Protein backbone atom coordinates (compact mmCIF):
# COMPACT_ATOMS: atom_id res chain seq x y z
CA UNK A 1 0.00 0.00 0.00
CA UNK A 2 1.14 3.56 -0.71
CA UNK A 3 2.26 5.49 2.38
CA UNK A 4 0.20 8.65 1.90
CA UNK A 5 2.19 10.64 4.47
CA UNK A 6 5.43 9.94 2.64
CA UNK A 7 3.89 10.98 -0.68
CA UNK A 8 2.58 14.18 0.89
CA UNK A 9 6.03 14.97 2.28
CA UNK A 10 7.65 14.39 -1.11
CA UNK A 11 5.11 16.64 -2.82
CA UNK A 12 5.80 19.39 -0.30
CA UNK A 13 9.55 19.18 -0.93
CA UNK A 14 8.99 19.12 -4.69
CA UNK A 15 6.76 22.20 -4.64
CA UNK A 16 9.33 24.09 -2.62
CA UNK A 17 11.85 23.49 -5.40
CA UNK A 18 9.26 24.34 -8.06
CA UNK A 19 8.65 27.72 -6.42
CA UNK A 20 12.39 28.31 -6.23
CA UNK A 21 12.66 27.58 -9.96
CA UNK A 22 9.49 29.55 -10.84
CA UNK A 23 7.70 26.51 -12.29
CA UNK A 24 3.93 26.10 -12.31
CA UNK A 25 4.05 22.35 -12.96
CA UNK A 26 6.46 19.46 -13.30
CA UNK A 27 5.97 16.35 -15.45
CA UNK A 28 7.26 12.90 -14.48
CA UNK A 29 7.12 10.39 -17.36
CA UNK A 30 7.70 6.66 -16.90
CA UNK A 31 10.84 6.46 -18.99
CA UNK A 32 14.56 6.85 -18.42
CA UNK A 33 17.09 8.60 -20.72
CA UNK A 34 16.79 5.61 -23.07
CA UNK A 35 12.98 5.63 -23.41
CA UNK A 36 12.80 2.21 -21.75
CA UNK A 37 9.54 0.54 -20.77
CA UNK A 38 11.19 -1.05 -17.74
CA UNK A 39 13.70 1.29 -16.12
CA UNK A 40 16.57 1.05 -13.62
CA UNK A 41 15.57 2.14 -10.13
CA UNK A 42 17.43 5.44 -10.52
CA UNK A 43 14.82 6.66 -12.97
CA UNK A 44 11.67 5.47 -11.19
CA UNK A 45 10.79 9.07 -10.42
CA UNK A 46 7.13 8.75 -11.30
CA UNK A 47 6.78 5.86 -8.87
CA UNK A 48 8.72 7.75 -6.19
CA UNK A 49 6.57 10.88 -6.37
CA UNK A 50 3.15 9.22 -6.80
CA UNK A 51 3.32 5.70 -5.36
CA UNK A 52 2.01 4.19 -8.61
CA UNK A 53 4.28 1.37 -9.78
CA UNK A 54 2.78 0.35 -13.14
CA UNK A 55 5.03 0.22 -16.19
CA UNK A 56 3.11 2.97 -18.02
CA UNK A 57 1.94 6.32 -16.73
CA UNK A 58 2.77 10.00 -16.36
CA UNK A 59 2.52 12.00 -13.14
CA UNK A 60 2.04 15.77 -13.18
CA UNK A 61 2.37 17.99 -10.13
CA UNK A 62 1.31 21.64 -10.05
CA UNK A 63 1.66 24.05 -7.15
CA UNK A 64 -1.94 23.28 -6.19
CA UNK A 65 -2.80 19.76 -7.40
CA UNK A 66 -1.49 16.46 -8.77
CA UNK A 67 -2.70 13.90 -11.31
CA UNK A 68 -1.58 10.67 -12.93
CA UNK A 69 -2.38 9.44 -16.45
CA UNK A 70 -2.32 5.73 -17.26
CA UNK A 71 -3.95 3.29 -19.66
CA UNK A 72 -6.73 0.75 -19.16
CA UNK A 73 -4.37 -2.03 -18.04
CA UNK A 74 -3.76 -0.10 -14.83
CA UNK A 75 -7.04 1.69 -14.07
CA UNK A 76 -7.93 -0.51 -11.10
CA UNK A 77 -4.40 -0.82 -9.74
CA UNK A 78 -3.77 2.92 -10.05
CA UNK A 79 -7.03 3.76 -8.29
CA UNK A 80 -5.98 1.59 -5.36
CA UNK A 81 -2.39 2.85 -5.19
CA UNK A 82 -3.34 6.53 -5.46
CA UNK A 83 -6.08 6.29 -2.83
CA UNK A 84 -5.51 8.76 0.00
CA UNK A 85 -2.96 10.82 -1.92
CA UNK A 86 -3.44 14.12 -3.75
CA UNK A 87 -3.16 12.38 -7.08
CA UNK A 88 -6.25 12.31 -9.26
CA UNK A 89 -6.43 9.35 -11.66
CA UNK A 90 -6.73 10.30 -15.32
CA UNK A 91 -7.94 7.40 -17.44
CA UNK A 92 -6.27 7.68 -20.83
CA UNK A 93 -8.25 7.37 -24.07
CA UNK A 94 -11.60 8.08 -22.41
CA UNK A 95 -13.59 10.92 -23.96
CA UNK A 96 -13.82 12.99 -20.78
CA UNK A 97 -10.13 12.70 -19.85
CA UNK A 98 -8.15 15.89 -20.52
CA UNK A 99 -4.71 15.74 -22.06
CA UNK A 100 -1.79 16.66 -19.83
CA UNK A 101 -1.46 20.17 -21.35
CA UNK A 102 -5.24 20.71 -21.06
CA UNK A 103 -5.19 19.76 -17.39
CA UNK A 104 -2.15 21.93 -16.62
CA UNK A 105 -3.86 24.90 -18.27
CA UNK A 106 -7.04 24.22 -16.27
CA UNK A 107 -5.07 24.16 -13.00
CA UNK A 108 -3.25 27.41 -13.71
CA UNK A 109 -4.11 30.28 -11.35
CA UNK A 110 -3.45 34.00 -11.48
CA UNK A 111 0.12 34.72 -10.52
CA UNK A 112 1.41 31.27 -11.42
CA UNK A 113 4.46 30.98 -13.62
CA UNK A 114 3.85 30.11 -17.26
CA UNK A 115 6.75 27.64 -17.27
CA UNK A 116 6.28 23.85 -17.04
CA UNK A 117 9.24 21.65 -16.15
CA UNK A 118 10.36 18.22 -17.30
CA UNK A 119 13.71 16.45 -17.29
CA UNK A 120 14.56 16.55 -20.97
CA UNK A 121 16.74 13.47 -20.55
CA UNK A 122 13.64 11.41 -19.71
CA UNK A 123 11.18 12.45 -22.42
CA UNK A 124 11.39 11.70 -26.12
CA UNK A 125 11.94 14.47 -28.66
CA UNK A 126 8.59 13.81 -30.34
CA UNK A 127 6.71 13.93 -27.02
CA UNK A 128 8.31 17.20 -25.95
CA UNK A 129 7.61 18.85 -29.29
CA UNK A 130 3.96 17.78 -29.22
CA UNK A 131 3.55 18.95 -25.63
CA UNK A 132 5.26 22.27 -26.27
CA UNK A 133 2.91 23.01 -29.15
CA UNK A 134 -0.22 22.14 -27.16
CA UNK A 135 0.86 24.09 -24.06
CA UNK A 136 1.56 27.17 -26.15
CA UNK A 137 -1.78 26.87 -27.91
CA UNK A 138 -3.76 26.43 -24.69
CA UNK A 139 -2.40 29.27 -22.62
CA UNK A 140 0.93 30.54 -23.74
CA UNK A 141 2.69 28.06 -21.46
CA UNK A 142 6.33 27.17 -22.11
CA UNK A 143 8.48 24.16 -21.23
CA UNK A 144 11.79 24.07 -19.40
CA UNK A 145 13.72 20.88 -20.10
CA UNK A 146 17.12 21.37 -18.46
CA UNK A 147 16.28 20.50 -14.84
CA UNK A 148 16.49 17.11 -13.14
CA UNK A 149 14.53 18.25 -10.10
CA UNK A 150 14.64 14.80 -8.51
CA UNK A 151 18.34 15.29 -7.77
CA UNK A 152 17.31 17.93 -5.24
CA UNK A 153 14.44 16.16 -3.49
CA UNK A 154 15.14 12.41 -3.78
CA UNK A 155 17.82 12.23 -1.11
CA UNK A 156 18.45 8.46 -1.31
CA UNK A 157 18.15 8.20 -5.08
CA UNK A 158 19.90 5.11 -6.50
CA UNK A 159 22.95 5.60 -8.70
CA UNK A 160 23.44 4.43 -12.28
CA UNK A 161 23.87 0.62 -12.11
CA UNK A 162 27.38 -0.85 -12.16
CA UNK A 163 26.56 -4.51 -12.87
CA UNK A 164 29.06 -6.40 -15.03
CA UNK A 165 28.32 -6.98 -18.71
CA UNK A 166 28.42 -10.50 -20.21
CA UNK A 167 28.92 -11.76 -23.76
CA UNK A 168 25.96 -13.53 -25.38
CA UNK A 169 27.49 -16.63 -27.04
CA UNK A 170 27.24 -16.99 -30.82
CA UNK A 171 25.42 -20.31 -30.43
CA UNK A 172 22.47 -18.33 -29.06
CA UNK A 173 22.85 -15.04 -30.97
CA UNK A 174 23.37 -16.61 -34.39
CA UNK A 175 25.01 -13.51 -35.88
CA UNK A 176 28.24 -11.76 -34.98
CA UNK A 177 28.21 -8.19 -33.69
CA UNK A 178 30.44 -7.08 -36.59
CA UNK A 179 27.97 -8.53 -39.10
CA UNK A 180 25.06 -6.77 -37.40
CA UNK A 181 26.94 -3.48 -37.52
CA UNK A 182 27.57 -3.95 -41.24
CA UNK A 183 23.87 -4.62 -41.86
CA UNK A 184 22.91 -1.55 -39.85
CA UNK A 185 25.35 0.61 -41.84
CA UNK A 186 23.88 -0.66 -45.09
CA UNK A 187 20.37 0.28 -43.96
CA UNK A 188 21.58 3.69 -42.80
CA UNK A 189 23.03 4.40 -46.24
CA UNK A 190 19.66 3.60 -47.78
CA UNK A 191 18.12 6.17 -45.42
CA UNK A 192 20.65 8.82 -46.39
CA UNK A 193 22.70 8.63 -43.18
CA UNK A 194 26.36 7.90 -42.49
CA UNK A 195 25.82 7.11 -38.82
CA UNK A 196 23.27 6.95 -36.02
CA UNK A 197 22.76 7.42 -32.31
CA UNK A 198 21.32 4.25 -30.78
CA UNK A 199 19.67 4.92 -27.42
CA UNK A 200 17.37 2.01 -26.56
CA UNK A 201 19.01 -0.50 -24.26
CA UNK A 202 17.66 -3.69 -25.81
CA UNK A 203 18.71 -2.48 -29.28
CA UNK A 204 22.25 -1.89 -28.01
CA UNK A 205 22.40 -5.26 -26.24
CA UNK A 206 21.16 -7.05 -29.38
CA UNK A 207 23.57 -5.22 -31.69
CA UNK A 208 26.63 -5.94 -29.56
CA UNK A 209 25.61 -9.45 -28.41
CA UNK A 210 26.02 -8.38 -24.78
CA UNK A 211 23.74 -8.83 -21.78
CA UNK A 212 23.63 -7.51 -18.20
CA UNK A 213 21.32 -7.11 -15.18
CA UNK A 214 20.87 -3.34 -14.94
CA UNK A 215 17.08 -3.54 -15.29
CA UNK A 216 14.81 -5.77 -13.23
CA UNK A 217 13.92 -8.89 -15.25
CA UNK A 218 15.44 -7.44 -18.46
CA UNK A 219 19.07 -8.35 -19.30
CA UNK A 220 20.29 -5.00 -20.61
CA UNK A 221 22.88 -2.40 -19.58
CA UNK A 222 22.76 1.39 -19.33
CA UNK A 223 24.69 2.76 -22.30
CA UNK A 224 24.64 4.65 -25.60
CA UNK A 225 25.97 3.48 -28.96
CA UNK A 226 27.06 5.67 -31.86
CA UNK A 227 27.46 3.76 -35.12
CA UNK A 228 29.31 5.49 -37.95
CA UNK A 229 30.34 4.23 -41.37
CA UNK A 230 33.90 3.63 -40.19
CA UNK A 231 33.56 3.20 -36.42
CA UNK A 232 31.31 2.37 -33.48
CA UNK A 233 31.57 3.72 -29.93
CA UNK A 234 29.89 2.34 -26.82
CA UNK A 235 29.32 4.89 -24.05
CA UNK A 236 29.18 3.01 -20.75
CA UNK A 237 30.53 3.16 -17.20
CA UNK A 238 33.98 1.64 -17.54
CA UNK A 239 33.66 -0.34 -14.31
CA UNK A 240 30.94 -2.44 -15.95
CA UNK A 241 33.36 -3.99 -18.44
CA UNK A 242 35.47 -7.03 -17.58
CA UNK A 243 38.80 -7.56 -19.39
CA UNK A 244 37.08 -10.28 -21.42
CA UNK A 245 34.38 -7.87 -22.63
CA UNK A 246 36.93 -5.12 -23.36
CA UNK A 247 38.90 -7.56 -25.53
CA UNK A 248 35.70 -8.74 -27.23
CA UNK A 249 34.64 -5.19 -28.11
CA UNK A 250 38.08 -4.44 -29.51
CA UNK A 251 37.84 -7.59 -31.62
CA UNK A 252 34.49 -6.36 -32.97
CA UNK A 253 35.98 -2.90 -33.74
CA UNK A 254 33.87 -1.17 -31.10
CA UNK A 255 35.52 1.66 -29.15
CA UNK A 256 34.57 2.45 -25.54
CA UNK A 257 33.94 5.80 -23.84
CA UNK A 258 32.41 6.85 -20.52
CA UNK A 259 28.61 6.94 -20.27
CA UNK A 260 28.47 10.58 -19.18
CA UNK A 261 30.59 11.71 -22.16
CA UNK A 262 27.81 11.15 -24.69
CA UNK A 263 27.11 14.84 -25.34
CA UNK A 264 30.75 15.64 -26.08
CA UNK A 265 30.92 12.41 -28.07
CA UNK A 266 28.08 13.52 -30.33
CA UNK A 267 29.78 16.82 -31.00
CA UNK A 268 32.78 14.95 -32.42
CA UNK A 269 30.80 13.71 -35.44
CA UNK A 270 31.22 16.84 -37.52
CA UNK A 271 30.63 16.21 -41.20
CA UNK A 272 28.48 13.13 -40.60
CA UNK A 273 24.80 12.72 -41.30
CA UNK A 274 23.37 11.04 -38.19
CA UNK A 275 20.04 9.26 -38.09
CA UNK A 276 18.17 10.13 -34.91
CA UNK A 277 14.82 8.51 -34.12
CA UNK A 278 12.53 11.21 -32.68
CA UNK A 279 10.40 8.60 -30.91
CA UNK A 280 13.30 7.10 -28.96
CA UNK A 281 15.96 9.80 -28.55
CA UNK A 282 15.51 11.96 -25.48
CA UNK A 283 14.94 15.66 -25.94
CA UNK A 284 18.22 16.77 -24.36
CA UNK A 285 20.38 14.68 -26.69
CA UNK A 286 18.32 15.76 -29.67
CA UNK A 287 19.26 19.36 -28.93
CA UNK A 288 23.02 18.79 -28.89
CA UNK A 289 24.53 21.10 -31.45
CA UNK A 290 27.40 19.55 -33.36
CA UNK A 291 28.64 20.10 -36.89
CA UNK A 292 26.58 17.20 -38.24
CA UNK A 293 23.38 16.91 -40.22
CA UNK A 294 20.41 15.02 -38.81
CA UNK A 295 18.11 12.58 -40.55
CA UNK A 296 14.98 12.31 -38.41
CA UNK A 297 13.63 8.81 -39.06
CA UNK A 298 12.77 5.54 -37.32
CA UNK A 299 15.76 3.47 -36.27
CA UNK A 300 16.26 0.39 -38.47
CA UNK A 301 17.40 -1.73 -35.51
CA UNK A 302 14.06 -2.72 -33.89
CA UNK A 303 12.79 -4.22 -37.15
CA UNK A 304 16.07 -6.08 -37.62
CA UNK A 305 15.99 -7.38 -34.04
CA UNK A 306 12.38 -8.52 -34.44
CA UNK A 307 13.29 -11.05 -37.16
CA UNK A 308 15.03 -13.83 -35.28
CA UNK A 309 18.02 -15.74 -36.58
CA UNK A 310 17.71 -19.50 -36.95
CA UNK A 311 19.86 -19.89 -33.85
CA UNK A 312 17.48 -17.64 -31.92
CA UNK A 313 14.44 -19.60 -33.16
CA UNK A 314 16.03 -22.87 -32.08
CA UNK A 315 16.89 -21.26 -28.76
CA UNK A 316 13.25 -20.36 -28.23
CA UNK A 317 12.20 -23.94 -28.92
CA UNK A 318 14.69 -25.29 -26.38
CA UNK A 319 13.77 -22.67 -23.78
CA UNK A 320 10.06 -23.42 -24.24
CA UNK A 321 10.70 -27.12 -23.59
CA UNK A 322 12.34 -26.35 -20.26
CA UNK A 323 9.73 -23.74 -19.40
CA UNK A 324 6.99 -26.23 -20.28
CA UNK A 325 8.48 -28.81 -17.92
CA UNK A 326 8.51 -26.23 -15.12
CA UNK A 327 4.90 -25.24 -15.89
CA UNK A 328 3.69 -28.86 -15.90
CA UNK A 329 5.36 -29.52 -12.56
CA UNK A 330 3.86 -26.32 -11.19
CA UNK A 331 0.31 -27.02 -12.39
CA UNK A 332 0.44 -30.57 -11.05
CA UNK A 333 1.68 -29.27 -7.69
CA UNK A 334 -0.95 -26.49 -7.64
CA UNK A 335 -3.77 -28.97 -8.17
CA UNK A 336 -2.69 -30.85 -5.06
CA UNK A 337 -1.69 -27.85 -2.94
CA UNK A 338 -4.72 -25.55 -3.18
CA UNK A 339 -7.19 -27.90 -1.41
CA UNK A 340 -4.86 -27.97 1.59
CA UNK A 341 -5.65 -24.28 2.16
CA UNK A 342 -2.12 -22.95 2.69
CA UNK A 343 -1.41 -21.22 -0.63
CA UNK A 344 -1.71 -17.56 -1.60
CA UNK A 345 -1.08 -15.53 -4.74
CA UNK A 346 2.45 -14.77 -3.57
CA UNK A 347 3.30 -18.28 -2.44
CA UNK A 348 2.35 -19.86 -5.77
CA UNK A 349 4.30 -17.16 -7.63
CA UNK A 350 7.38 -18.07 -5.62
CA UNK A 351 6.83 -21.80 -6.16
CA UNK A 352 6.73 -21.26 -9.92
CA UNK A 353 9.93 -19.21 -9.77
CA UNK A 354 11.65 -21.99 -7.84
CA UNK A 355 10.61 -24.64 -10.37
CA UNK A 356 11.84 -22.51 -13.26
CA UNK A 357 15.12 -21.84 -11.46
CA UNK A 358 15.77 -25.60 -11.44
CA UNK A 359 15.94 -25.57 -15.24
CA UNK A 360 19.28 -25.22 -17.07
CA UNK A 361 20.14 -21.73 -18.40
CA UNK A 362 17.53 -20.02 -16.20
CA UNK A 363 18.61 -16.47 -15.37
CA UNK A 364 15.57 -14.63 -13.98
CA UNK A 365 11.88 -14.08 -14.41
CA UNK A 366 11.07 -12.06 -17.54
CA UNK A 367 8.68 -9.87 -15.50
CA UNK A 368 7.07 -9.94 -12.08
CA UNK A 369 4.47 -12.70 -12.03
CA UNK A 370 0.84 -11.66 -12.33
CA UNK A 371 -1.09 -14.04 -10.08
CA UNK A 372 -4.66 -12.82 -9.72
CA UNK A 373 -7.21 -14.92 -7.87
CA UNK A 374 -10.86 -14.24 -8.76
CA UNK A 375 -11.45 -10.46 -8.45
CA UNK A 376 -7.71 -9.75 -8.64
CA UNK A 377 -7.69 -11.50 -12.01
CA UNK A 378 -9.83 -8.64 -13.34
CA UNK A 379 -6.91 -6.24 -12.71
CA UNK A 380 -5.06 -6.66 -15.99
CA UNK A 381 -1.52 -6.13 -14.66
CA UNK A 382 -2.09 -7.02 -11.02
CA UNK A 383 1.04 -8.02 -9.13
CA UNK A 384 0.47 -9.41 -5.63
CA UNK A 385 2.20 -7.67 -2.75
CA UNK A 386 2.30 -8.62 0.93
CA UNK A 387 -0.48 -6.07 1.49
CA UNK A 388 -2.74 -7.25 -1.36
CA UNK A 389 -1.96 -10.99 -1.20
CA UNK A 390 -4.99 -13.23 -0.67
CA UNK A 391 -5.37 -16.99 -0.05
CA UNK A 392 -6.40 -19.34 -2.84
CA UNK A 393 -9.53 -21.40 -2.29
CA UNK A 394 -10.57 -24.60 -4.09
CA UNK A 395 -13.02 -22.64 -6.22
CA UNK A 396 -12.96 -19.98 -8.91
CA UNK A 397 -10.22 -18.88 -11.31
CA UNK A 398 -6.54 -18.09 -10.86
CA UNK A 399 -5.11 -15.96 -13.68
CA UNK A 400 -1.37 -16.61 -13.89
CA UNK A 401 0.75 -14.55 -16.30
CA UNK A 402 4.45 -15.31 -15.97
CA UNK A 403 7.68 -15.79 -17.86
CA UNK A 404 11.37 -16.51 -17.59
CA UNK A 405 14.68 -15.37 -18.97
CA UNK A 406 16.82 -18.24 -20.21
CA UNK A 407 20.16 -17.66 -21.92
CA UNK A 408 18.67 -19.09 -25.12
CA UNK A 409 15.22 -17.49 -25.01
CA UNK A 410 12.58 -15.44 -23.21
CA UNK A 411 9.19 -16.89 -22.29
CA UNK A 412 5.79 -15.32 -21.61
CA UNK A 413 2.75 -17.46 -20.83
CA UNK A 414 -0.69 -16.93 -19.33
CA UNK A 415 -2.99 -19.65 -18.12
CA UNK A 416 -6.31 -19.21 -16.37
CA UNK A 417 -6.72 -22.15 -14.02
CA UNK A 418 -9.94 -23.49 -12.53
CA UNK A 419 -9.25 -24.23 -8.86
CA UNK A 420 -12.66 -25.74 -8.13
CA UNK A 421 -16.36 -25.08 -8.79
CA UNK A 422 -17.10 -22.04 -10.97
CA UNK A 423 -20.25 -20.36 -12.26
CA UNK A 424 -21.72 -20.68 -15.73
CA UNK A 425 -20.52 -17.12 -16.36
CA UNK A 426 -16.94 -18.14 -15.56
CA UNK A 427 -17.18 -20.98 -18.05
CA UNK A 428 -18.79 -18.90 -20.78
CA UNK A 429 -16.26 -16.07 -20.50
CA UNK A 430 -13.38 -18.57 -20.43
CA UNK A 431 -14.63 -20.24 -23.60
CA UNK A 432 -15.01 -16.93 -25.43
CA UNK A 433 -11.39 -16.07 -24.65
CA UNK A 434 -10.25 -19.53 -25.71
CA UNK A 435 -12.10 -19.20 -29.03
CA UNK A 436 -10.24 -15.97 -29.76
CA UNK A 437 -6.91 -17.47 -28.77
CA UNK A 438 -7.35 -20.55 -30.95
CA UNK A 439 -8.63 -18.55 -33.92
CA UNK A 440 -5.55 -16.34 -33.97
CA UNK A 441 -3.13 -19.20 -33.37
CA UNK A 442 -4.60 -21.07 -36.36
CA UNK A 443 -4.80 -18.06 -38.67
CA UNK A 444 -2.97 -17.95 -42.02
CA UNK A 445 -2.39 -14.65 -43.81
CA UNK A 446 -0.40 -12.94 -46.57
CA UNK A 447 3.23 -12.28 -45.72
CA UNK A 448 3.58 -8.61 -44.78
CA UNK A 449 0.13 -8.13 -43.27
CA UNK A 450 0.14 -5.72 -40.33
CA UNK A 451 -0.77 -6.75 -36.81
CA UNK A 452 -3.73 -4.40 -36.89
CA UNK A 453 -5.26 -6.56 -39.63
CA UNK A 454 -5.03 -9.64 -37.38
CA UNK A 455 -6.39 -8.14 -34.18
CA UNK A 456 -10.09 -8.67 -34.90
CA UNK A 457 -9.52 -12.41 -35.36
CA UNK A 458 -8.98 -12.76 -31.61
CA UNK A 459 -11.92 -10.51 -30.71
CA UNK A 460 -14.71 -11.52 -33.07
CA UNK A 461 -16.30 -14.20 -30.87
CA UNK A 462 -16.52 -11.91 -27.85
CA UNK A 463 -17.64 -8.95 -29.99
CA UNK A 464 -20.68 -11.00 -31.00
CA UNK A 465 -21.50 -11.19 -27.28
CA UNK A 466 -20.98 -7.46 -26.75
CA UNK A 467 -17.71 -7.99 -24.87
CA UNK A 468 -14.17 -6.69 -25.43
CA UNK A 469 -10.78 -6.09 -23.81
CA UNK A 470 -8.88 -2.83 -23.80
CA UNK A 471 -5.30 -4.04 -24.14
CA UNK A 472 -3.40 -5.24 -27.19
CA UNK A 473 -3.68 -8.81 -28.42
CA UNK A 474 0.01 -9.47 -29.02
CA UNK A 475 3.52 -8.09 -28.70
CA UNK A 476 6.94 -9.22 -29.83
CA UNK A 477 9.22 -11.10 -27.43
CA UNK A 478 12.98 -10.66 -27.28
CA UNK A 479 15.63 -13.38 -27.41
CA UNK A 480 17.00 -13.26 -23.86
CA UNK A 481 16.01 -9.60 -23.96
CA UNK A 482 12.89 -7.59 -23.21
CA UNK A 483 9.69 -9.59 -22.87
CA UNK A 484 7.94 -6.72 -24.68
CA UNK A 485 9.46 -6.05 -28.09
CA UNK A 486 8.41 -4.16 -31.20
CA UNK A 487 7.97 -2.65 -33.64
CA UNK A 488 5.27 -5.17 -34.64
CA UNK A 489 2.21 -5.60 -32.45
CA UNK A 490 -1.24 -7.11 -32.77
CA UNK A 491 -3.63 -4.45 -31.53
CA UNK A 492 -6.59 -2.31 -32.58
CA UNK A 493 -4.53 0.88 -32.87
CA UNK A 494 -2.73 1.07 -36.18
CA UNK A 495 0.70 -0.53 -36.33
CA UNK A 496 2.01 -0.73 -39.89
CA UNK A 497 5.00 -3.01 -39.35
CA UNK A 498 4.66 -6.02 -41.66
CA UNK A 499 4.53 -9.48 -40.08
CA UNK A 500 7.20 -11.71 -41.65
CA UNK A 501 8.90 -15.03 -41.02
CA UNK A 502 11.08 -15.14 -37.92
CA UNK A 503 9.01 -12.75 -35.82
CA UNK A 504 7.78 -13.84 -32.41
CA UNK A 505 4.47 -12.49 -31.14
CA UNK A 506 2.14 -13.29 -28.27
CA UNK A 507 -1.49 -14.36 -28.64
CA UNK A 508 -3.23 -13.15 -25.48
CA UNK A 509 -6.89 -12.18 -25.65
CA UNK A 510 -8.68 -11.70 -22.35
CA UNK A 511 -11.90 -10.64 -20.67
CA UNK A 512 -12.14 -8.90 -17.31
CA UNK A 513 -15.22 -8.48 -15.15
CA UNK A 514 -14.41 -5.87 -12.52
CA UNK A 515 -14.60 -7.11 -8.93
CA UNK A 516 -15.47 -10.62 -10.12
CA UNK A 517 -12.79 -12.39 -12.16
CA UNK A 518 -10.58 -12.22 -15.23
CA UNK A 519 -9.56 -14.63 -17.97
CA UNK A 520 -6.52 -14.47 -20.24
CA UNK A 521 -4.83 -17.21 -22.27
CA UNK A 522 -1.43 -16.55 -23.82
CA UNK A 523 1.08 -18.40 -25.97
CA UNK A 524 4.15 -17.11 -27.79
CA UNK A 525 3.91 -17.74 -31.54
CA UNK A 526 6.54 -17.74 -34.29
CA UNK A 527 5.71 -16.54 -37.82
CA UNK A 528 6.72 -19.31 -40.25
CA UNK A 529 6.19 -19.97 -44.01
CA UNK A 530 2.89 -21.52 -45.07
CA UNK A 531 2.36 -21.67 -48.85
CA UNK A 532 3.25 -19.74 -51.99
CA UNK A 533 0.58 -19.41 -54.68
CA UNK A 534 -0.13 -17.23 -57.69
CA UNK A 535 -1.46 -14.71 -55.14
CA UNK A 536 1.81 -14.47 -53.25
CA UNK A 537 3.51 -15.84 -50.14
CA UNK A 538 1.44 -16.78 -47.12
CA UNK A 539 2.56 -17.36 -43.54
CA UNK A 540 1.12 -18.96 -40.43
CA UNK A 541 1.93 -19.27 -36.73
CA UNK A 542 3.94 -21.98 -35.01
CA UNK A 543 3.07 -22.15 -31.29
CA UNK A 544 6.28 -22.02 -29.28
CA UNK A 545 4.74 -22.20 -25.80
CA UNK A 546 4.33 -25.76 -24.54
CA UNK A 547 1.83 -26.05 -21.70
CA UNK A 548 -1.66 -27.55 -21.40
CA UNK A 549 -4.61 -25.19 -21.53
CA UNK A 550 -7.16 -25.96 -18.81
CA UNK A 551 -10.06 -27.79 -20.47
CA UNK A 552 -12.15 -28.08 -17.29
CA UNK A 553 -14.03 -24.77 -17.68
CA UNK A 554 -14.69 -25.11 -21.42
CA UNK A 555 -18.27 -25.03 -22.66
CA UNK A 556 -17.55 -27.54 -25.42
CA UNK A 557 -20.71 -26.73 -27.38
CA UNK A 558 -19.45 -23.16 -27.83
CA UNK A 559 -16.39 -24.38 -29.76
CA UNK A 560 -16.59 -25.07 -33.47
CA UNK A 561 -15.26 -28.34 -34.86
CA UNK A 562 -12.24 -26.45 -36.20
CA UNK A 563 -11.53 -24.85 -32.82
CA UNK A 564 -11.69 -28.23 -31.09
CA UNK A 565 -9.35 -29.63 -33.71
CA UNK A 566 -6.84 -26.81 -33.16
CA UNK A 567 -6.92 -27.29 -29.39
CA UNK A 568 -6.55 -31.06 -29.66
CA UNK A 569 -3.64 -30.75 -32.10
CA UNK A 570 -1.93 -28.27 -29.80
CA UNK A 571 -2.36 -30.58 -26.81
CA UNK A 572 -1.05 -33.55 -28.78
CA UNK A 573 2.07 -31.52 -29.64
CA UNK A 574 2.49 -30.47 -25.99
CA UNK A 575 2.33 -34.08 -24.83
CA UNK A 576 4.67 -35.41 -27.52
CA UNK A 577 7.34 -32.82 -26.82
CA UNK A 578 7.18 -32.63 -23.04
CA UNK A 579 6.42 -36.20 -22.00
CA UNK A 580 9.96 -37.54 -22.68
CA UNK A 581 11.30 -34.95 -20.21
CA UNK A 582 8.94 -35.91 -17.36
CA UNK A 583 8.83 -38.70 -14.81
CA UNK A 584 6.09 -41.32 -14.89
CA UNK A 585 3.67 -39.50 -12.55
CA UNK A 586 4.13 -36.23 -14.43
CA UNK A 587 3.62 -37.92 -17.80
CA UNK A 588 0.36 -39.48 -16.63
CA UNK A 589 -0.86 -36.14 -15.29
CA UNK A 590 0.01 -34.46 -18.60
CA UNK A 591 -1.65 -37.24 -20.60
CA UNK A 592 -4.93 -36.60 -18.79
CA UNK A 593 -4.64 -32.81 -19.16
CA UNK A 594 -4.04 -33.07 -22.91
CA UNK A 595 -6.76 -35.59 -23.75
CA UNK A 596 -8.85 -34.67 -26.79
CA UNK A 597 -12.18 -32.99 -26.17
PLM regions and their residue ranges:
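Active-site neighborhoods and metal-handling regions in enzymes and metal-associated proteins
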Residues: 1-597
Amino acid sequence: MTDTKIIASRLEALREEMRREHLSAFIFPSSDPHMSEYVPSRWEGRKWISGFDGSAGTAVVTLHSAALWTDSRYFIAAEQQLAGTEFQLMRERLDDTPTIPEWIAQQSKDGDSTEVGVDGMCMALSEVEDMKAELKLLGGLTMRTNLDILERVWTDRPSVPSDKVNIQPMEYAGEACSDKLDRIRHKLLRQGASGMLLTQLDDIAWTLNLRCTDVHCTPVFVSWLIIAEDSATLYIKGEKLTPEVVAYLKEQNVDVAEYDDIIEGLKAYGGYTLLIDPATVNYTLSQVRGNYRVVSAPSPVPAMKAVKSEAECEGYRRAMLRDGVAMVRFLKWLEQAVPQGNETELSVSEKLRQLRAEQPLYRDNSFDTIAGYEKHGAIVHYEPTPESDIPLKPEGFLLLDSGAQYTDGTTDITRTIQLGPVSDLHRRVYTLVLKGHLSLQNFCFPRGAAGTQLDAIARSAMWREGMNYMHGTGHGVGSYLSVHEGPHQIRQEYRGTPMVEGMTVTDEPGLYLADRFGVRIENVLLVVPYITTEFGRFVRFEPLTLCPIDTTPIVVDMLSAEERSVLNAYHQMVYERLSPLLNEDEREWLRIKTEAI
